[in-house]
Regions:
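N-terminal alpha-helical transmembrane segments of multi-pass membrane transport
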Residues: 1-75, 86-92, 103, 393, ...
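Membrane-interface loop-to-helix entry segments
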Residues: 19-23, 27-43, 167-170, 181-229, ...
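Alpha-helical membrane segments and immediately flanking helix-loop junctions
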Residues: 53-87, 113-131, 135-137, 148-151, ...
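Hydrophobic transmembrane alpha-helices that form the core helical bundles
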Residues: 87, 96-100, 104-119, 124-176, ...
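Selective recognition of specific alpha-helical transmembrane segments in multi-pass small-molecule
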Residues: 102-110, 187-201, 212-232, 265-266, ...
Length: 444
């Protein structure tokens, strides 16, 4: 079964890579690089400079960004990068950069649409995401795509990677190396998860609002210190990444295609551009204009892939552990931290992994709950939340390869309705963007 899941993931991502990257390139060209022209304005938005009293929505721009970042900045940046380097070599990082660059435009389009076509319930509750975009903007004949996304999202939002890697780094400590530790740790983690996720989006957003920025600064600061102490190795590390991206020398058989596929797979898991998950929370943002949230959302690939993933990759490459270690995932990153910063480095990574892993589980629970609500109504949400709690335990005890392949398959399937609807409605986004930026220029 494990081999079948692995083969299926490889097959699906072979064709999903050109679809994701090609769509991003289309959005870049079609928008005439508009997202990049307004990066400064996007940063002003997350600082609340252009917010208005009475905006419709559940959470602020900053909360929406940090909640979405808690799903993207996390173990994908720490363990996902290690897995990419381990399986495909440093060259995979170059292709992760590519997904981030085109992903900036993709996120602008998908998240703008999520606000444009979101649902506002009678009680004022706001719901967004690809399924509502399809429901409210496309012909009724396209509704199967909405159900397809939500069904795939039920699996894609399960905390497979996070639960597995969180338990792995804790289990690496000598004190916890005993029989059935993974099961015991999974049960404890499931209990903590239940306390948070049963509180809904508002509680998740409040936790993410302070936890994600704090842990991001701690992690990035630690990596920055390690890089400064080894500054003479930074340029050679970049040279290794770029050279390996076009040779595939670190992959068995020297396949460049394998390097590209792995880089895009891990890039998609890192920044989620084009997958549709991030639109679920950005669609709930308090905003008077959809374009504002599209601008805020497009910052995610910059933070999580271009900054965080690159930092982790440089750390692992400079440490040299990727050449000599058989460790996998978060353990390989931990060895790199220990090699460059000693026991203190490991301690910092441990704190960050626990925090990031937990916050990502909380965010993914909201993603899955939103899909469940669309398919089954409010009664389905509570049931699905208990399913998440159960699967925290399940994924804690299965091999990392199985956990990550299951999520990768689901992500690839979720991208299909997301990108179809976004390409279809791209002219609507451009029309809204022109209105917004014209008004912005007149007011300045």
């Amino acid at each position: 079964m494990e081999n079948f899941i692995s083969d299926l993931a490889s097959f699906i991502w072979t064709w999903n890579v050109p679809v994701l990257v090609g769509s991003g390139i289309f959005f870049l060209i079609y928008s005439k690089l508009t997202p990049f022209k307004y990066l400064k304005h996007a940063f002003e938005l997350i600082l609340g400079k252009h917010s208005k009293e009475g905006d419709i929505g559940e959470v602020t721009h900053f909360q929406a960004l940090t909640t979405a970042l808690s799903g993207t900045i996390g173990l994908g940046n720490i363990a996902g990068v290690a897995i990419a380097i381990q399986l495909a070599g440093p060259g995979a990082i170059f292709w992760m950069w590519l997904t981030a660059v085109v992903g900036i435009a993709t996120k602008f389009f998908t998240c703008t649409l999520s606000v444009m076509y979101r649902d506002v319930g009678e009680d004022g509750t706001v719901r967004g995401g690809p399924m509502y975009v399809i429901k409210n903007a496309l012909p009724n004949s396209m509704m199967p795509l909405a159900y397809f996304f939500a069904a795939a999202g039920l699996i894609g939002a399960l905390p497979g990677f996070q639960s597995n890697q969180l338990v792995q780094i804790i289990g690496d400590l000598p004190i916890f190396q005993f029989d059935n530790f993974n099961l015991i740790a999974g049960v404890i983690l499931a209990g903590v998860t239940g306390v948070i996720i049963l509180g809904g989006l508002i509680r998740i957003a409040k936790v993410s609002e302070w936890l994600v920025p704090l842990m991001s600064l701690l992690y990035f600061g630690s990596v920055l210190i390690a890089l400064m102490l080894n500054y003479d190795s930074i340029i050679p590390a970049f040279q290794i990444i770029i050279a390996d991206a076009f040779t595939g020398s670190a992959v068995a058989g020297g396949s460049v295609i394998a390097v590209i596929i792995m880089g895009v797979r891990r890039g998609a898991h890192s920044n989620e551009a084009g997958i549709g998950t991030e639109t679920l929370v950005h669609g709930s943002a308090k905003t008077s204009d959809p374009v504002k949230q599209g601008l805020v959302a497009m910052l995610c690939p910059i933070f999580d892939t271009l900054i965080m993933c690159t930092s982790t990759a440089l750390l692992i490459i400079i440490s040299g552990v990727w050449l000599i270690s058989d460790s996998t995932g978060v353990t390989l990153t931990a060895e790199a931290f220990s090699a460059l910063l000693g026991p203190l480095g490991y301690a910092v990574l441990f704190i960050c992994v626990v925090s990031f892993g937990a916050s990502t589980i909380f965010t993914y629970s909201f993603y899955g709950s939103a899909c469940s609500q669309f398919l089954f109504g409010e009664k389905g949400v509570k049931f699905y939340q208990w399913v998440i709690i159960l699967f925290v335990i399940v994924f804690a005890v299965i091999p990392i390869e199985a956990a990550i392949n299951i999520i990768d398959i689901s992500f690839a399937l979720m991208a299909i309705p997301t990108l179809i609807s976004t390409v279809w409605l791209a002219p609507k986004v451009i029309f809204k963007a022109r209105e917004y930026f014209s008004a912005l220029e007149e007011s300045t």
